[in-house]
């Protein structure tokens, strides 16, 4: 049996059933931080079955303190909209040329945005973008005439959330280098958005469990009293 590191031994001493406030959880994660700037992540177990359309939880939320990571954005637009997207900081802007580029496997993007008139072109990329969760969607604000704002939102800390098979939803909400108050503000914005996105088909208790963790740190259960409306 492999010998446990000192850090693993310290983590093993933590009570896995203890409920923490967000302040306490951040403090514990800082006590067990790694030598690199870890991502801080929140995970929520929801009382939904996403196999049913009326129990899907999906949307966008802007984190007030940003995510701490560089977001690569591609935009399908022409003319004036293309110029606005470029000025807003898009990493790649194009039309048919961008479609061909993506068909050739160049998909190193975190967000793909399109103007409505470009959906005829983007539609041909369904099999390429769909499996990666990158297909522009009007409900998520990624098909929009206002590409300038969409690019700024993507670059400025807007994250997409989508519930997974077992009713779990998770997202990075910042880095360990963030101040406590910035992590707390992002935690609140994210959990508020999930509570607000409660689907019509959800039955029984909606928010079952919330935990906070870091890239290499322990998973800490958060007291549901910390989540407004849970």
Swiss-Prot record:
<keyword id="KW-0699">rRNA-binding</keyword>
<dbReference type="InterPro" id="IPR002143">
    <property type="entry name" value="Ribosomal_uL1"/>
</dbReference>
<keyword id="KW-0694">RNA-binding</keyword>
<keyword id="KW-0810">Translation regulation</keyword>
<dbReference type="InterPro" id="IPR005878">
    <property type="entry name" value="Ribosom_uL1_bac-type"/>
</dbReference>
<comment type="similarity">
    <text>Belongs to the universal ribosomal protein uL1 family.</text>
</comment>
<dbReference type="InterPro" id="IPR023673">
    <property type="entry name" value="Ribosomal_uL1_CS"/>
</dbReference>
<protein>
    <recommendedName>
        <fullName>Large ribosomal subunit protein uL1</fullName>
    </recommendedName>
</protein>
<keyword id="KW-0678">Repressor</keyword>
<dbReference type="InterPro" id="IPR016095">
    <property type="entry name" value="Ribosomal_uL1_3-a/b-sand"/>
</dbReference>
<dbReference type="InterPro" id="IPR028364">
    <property type="entry name" value="Ribosomal_uL1/biogenesis"/>
</dbReference>
<dbReference type="GO" id="GO:0003735">
    <property type="term" value="F:structural constituent of ribosome"/>
</dbReference>
<keyword id="KW-0689">Ribosomal protein</keyword>
<dbReference type="GO" id="GO:0019843">
    <property type="term" value="F:rRNA binding"/>
</dbReference>
<comment type="function">
    <text>Binds directly to 23S rRNA. The L1 stalk is quite mobile in the ribosome, and is involved in E site tRNA release.</text>
</comment>
<comment type="subunit">
    <text>Part of the 50S ribosomal subunit.</text>
</comment>
<dbReference type="InterPro" id="IPR023674">
    <property type="entry name" value="Ribosomal_uL1-like"/>
</dbReference>
<dbReference type="GO" id="GO:0006412">
    <property type="term" value="P:translation"/>
</dbReference>
<dbReference type="GO" id="GO:0000049">
    <property type="term" value="F:tRNA binding"/>
</dbReference>
<dbReference type="GO" id="GO:0006417">
    <property type="term" value="P:regulation of translation"/>
</dbReference>
<comment type="function">
    <text>Protein L1 is also a translational repressor protein, it controls the translation of the L11 operon by binding to its mRNA.</text>
</comment>
<keyword id="KW-0820">tRNA-binding</keyword>
<dbReference type="Pfam" id="PF00687">
    <property type="entry name" value="Ribosomal_L1"/>
</dbReference>
<dbReference type="GO" id="GO:0022625">
    <property type="term" value="C:cytosolic large ribosomal subunit"/>
</dbReference>
<keyword id="KW-0687">Ribonucleoprotein</keyword>
